[in-house]
Amino acid sequence: MNVLAIGAHFDDIELGCGGALSKHVADGDNVYAYVATRSGFKNCQNIVVRSNETAAKEGEKAMDILGVELIKGRFNTLEVEFTDNLNLEILKIVEEKNIGLVYLHWMGDIHHDHQAVARASLHSCRHVPRQLMYRSNWYQSNLEFRGNFYIDITDFWEKKKKSIEAHESEMERTGRKWIDFFYNEAKNAGQRIGVDKAEVYEVVKWLV
C-alpha cells in the first residue's frame, strides 16, 4: 500500500501520526510525507525563533528515523491558504504515488496553516479510498475531535519519540511538554483498546 501523510509544518506529522507511519514502514508499505511549509518562523518582535534551514534539517532527520520519504513544500509559515497552488501540489503527489491511504490534519484545528492544509487535503485527496484525520497539538477548539479509529503503536512509540526529539530547536523552546503530552495521549488511547500505547484518528472515509 502507498501511504501519504500531509502536514503543514515539520513536526506536525511526527506528533500526529509518527507511530502509525513507523508501523506502515515495518509492514512494508511505501510511506511518503508532504510538509507544505518551510516551517521557519519569527516571534512578535520579528526575531527568528526557528530558521527555514534548521526546520528542514530537523525534519529530514525525523523522517529518516521513521523511514519515510520526505516531500518538501515551499509555502511560508502562517501564509498558507486554501488555493489551487496548494491543491495541485498535493494532487500531483497523490496521483504520481498512487496513494491508497492519507493521514491529514483534523479540520477542527484552530491553527491557520493546519486548517488550510486540512481543507486542501480533503479536496485533493477526495478520490483516495482511506482518509484519517490526526491531531498534532493540544489547542482547544469549539469543535469536537471524534476519535474513532485506533492504531496500536506500542512497538513504535520509541521511534515516534525519537522523531519528535529530532526537532531540537522546538524541544529547546517547549521543553518536554510535547513528549509528555503525546506520551499521555498514547497511553490513554491504548487503555481504551487494551494495548499499551495507541494513536487515535477521526475517520473521513474508509473503503473496505
Regions found by a protein language model. Name each.
Residues 1-4, 23, 27, 46, ...:
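Metal-dependent de-N-acetylase/amidase catalytic core
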Residues 2-10, 14-49:
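ATP-dependent adenylation/pyrophosphate-handling site
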Residues 31, 70, 131:
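Hydrophobic anchor at the start of a short beta-strand
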Residues 34-36, 73, 104, 134:
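Short glycine/serine/threonine-enriched helix-capping/active-site loop
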Residues 36, 64-76:
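A conserved beta-strand->alpha-helix junction
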Residues 41-68:
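Glycine-rich phosphate-binding loop and adjoining beta1-alpha1-beta2 segment
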